[in-house]
Amino acid sequence: NQDCLSDWSFYEQYCYKVF
């Protein structure tokens, strides 16, 4: 499931910030 903030992306099992 994708539980990231609007400006974050989901990769495998964690979120990362997209710049």
Swiss-Prot record:
It comes from the Eukaryota. GO terms for cellular component: extracellular region. The keyword Disulfide bond applies. Disulfide bonds join 4-15. It is found in: Secreted. GO terms for molecular function: carbohydrate binding. Residues 1-19 form the C-type lectin domain. Belongs to the true venom lectin family. This is C-type lectin domain-containing protein 1.
